[in-house]
């Protein structure tokens, strides 16, 4: 019986120790919770809030950067479209200017050709007039020479005819003056 009693006493003591252990553990745990709340929980919560604010700030910054990038891309696209339009307009203006220059050159060539033709016509007309004048002069000289020869031969033999011809000539010249 002794053993049974001792075993029962050991169990009761063990229960008592277990209960005391449990109470001490609970008290230590509660003290630890109070200390954690006072010293660690505030800084931990503050650190988590700061981290949360930092992450939110980074997200906002990233969102703003994304929006700025979208605006920049739109601006660049607009500038690119504007540059393409300006380039197309410049090419069109250059083409029109080249066509106008070509038309102007063609017109100038046509005018110069017409002037050259007209000048050639005038030169031909002038040369023809000179040739006609020279021909008339030659014909007149030839006619005079022929008439002189005829007159010499005819008047050389007839002195009365010569005298009448000279008188007639003098009368004609006096009448025209």
Swiss-Prot record:
InterPro entries: ATP_synth_b/b'su_bac/chlpt (IPR002146), ATP_synth_F0_bsu_bac (IPR005864), ATP_synthase_B_chain (IPR050059). GO terms for molecular function: proton-transporting ATP synthase activity, rotational mechanism; proton-transporting ATPase activity, rotational mechanism. The chain crosses the membrane at residues 16-36. The keyword S-adenosyl-L-methionine does not apply. It is found in: Cell membrane. Keywords: ATP synthesis, Cell membrane, CF(0), Hydrogen ion transport, Ion transport, Membrane, Transmembrane, Transmembrane helix, Transport. NCBIfam families: ATP_synt_b (TIGR01144). F(1)F(0) ATP synthase produces ATP from ADP in the presence of a proton or sodium gradient. F-type ATPases consist of two structural domains, F(1) containing the extramembraneous catalytic core and F(0) containing the membrane proton channel, linked together by a central stalk and a peripheral stalk. During catalysis, ATP synthesis in the catalytic domain of F(1) is coupled via a rotary mechanism of the central stalk subunits to proton translocation. Belongs to the ATPase B chain family. This is ATP synthase subunit b.
